[in-house]
Amino acid sequence: MSPETTNVAGHLRERGRTRRPRKFSKAAQVTNTPIFASFLQAGFECSTHKLKNGKRLDLVASTQHDRFVDLDYSRLRDFGIQTVREGLRWHLIERERGRYDFSSALTILRAAQRHGIEIIWDVFHFGWPDFLDIFSAEWANALTDLAGEFGRLLRAESSGKRFVAAVNEISFVAWGGGDDAFINPFCKGRGHELKRQLVRSSVRASRALRSELPDVQLVSPEPVIHIVGDPARPDDVRSAEAYRTSMFEAWDMLTGRLHPELGGDESILDIIGVNFYDRNQWWNFGQTIHRGEPEYRPFREILREVYCRYRRPLFVAETGTENADRPDWFAYVWDEVQAAIAAGIPVHGVCLYPILNHPGWEDDRHCYNGLWDYAEPDGNRKVYDPLAEEIRRRTSKERSICYESKLRST
């Protein structure tokens, strides 16, 4: 999800949490050693879902990242970025059930190898082939098979650390696709059903990845939110808190703490990705809460709450905003992350998402939300200087201090 979309929401918190003995995977152990090749990271928007009018999006193609990937990666060096987020374009890879063409992913993978770039891959990032129904058992089977095939590909074509998210933003897809009809499959009243399906599928796909790559580090990116109720209305306060804590449901299900019948356990959750935008806080069923307002919750507190609940290494998997607010927003998030680290929270990175301006999902409008603009015919992209300057200003403070010295266990 990019900042040009909408507020992120989950679903009302479920009751009947089941506690199970916790058995973390080796990769999930909290460490003071940096996990990623770089702390500052870049996310290449890769959504491929279909719109209500039947048009399929392909943001990798519309930003021409597939065409100019070498130039895109070479530009990252100017900012010390060595870690990126990319996604599989499932509709291109599996045009017929069980027949796989990974050429679109190999183009990205081999460019990354040429430039010394480390990739955090999403297997599923909102889009799937036309022949599948996301609510069906066959969809879960297909995602599991795709993950296994991709694991085999990574084993054959890459070395070193591998980071993979089976499903990106379970909560957002379940809300937007299952309750708000904002995104494919455009349903209402099926959010809980869709969330369970995505969790069940993610668990199976994660196990398929690990069967091929025992040392794979499984990443789970989810939106974090803050919602405030009307203090004069106790029912509204309770409703807001239930809504707010729904942001934990996907992670709770993946770990088997909630609905263990879906197959989750603690070993599925290695690294938590926290997705946080400038519209992720709002009044219950009301307006956005902005920074500077008394009800706005500091991001460092959200990071602490997530860490204390799961005791996993964290990174900011997505953050950004549009237009002239970009530099100020980056500075805010960066400073909050540094404050969290200083307080002992193991945050291992900040990913600017998206790193490239892109066409709007619904209207193709020019979204000025990246560090670089649309590609010119020769592949050159104009940098947004105010954001570039703010990035250099903030990151220069850290370059003389290796960031592992700032990470502390709590």
Question: What are these model-predicted stretches?
Answer:
Residues 85-88:
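Active-site gating/metal-coordination segments in enzymes
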Residues 2-67, 73, 77-79, 94-410:
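Non-catalytic scaffold segments within catalytic domains of secreted glycoside hydrolases
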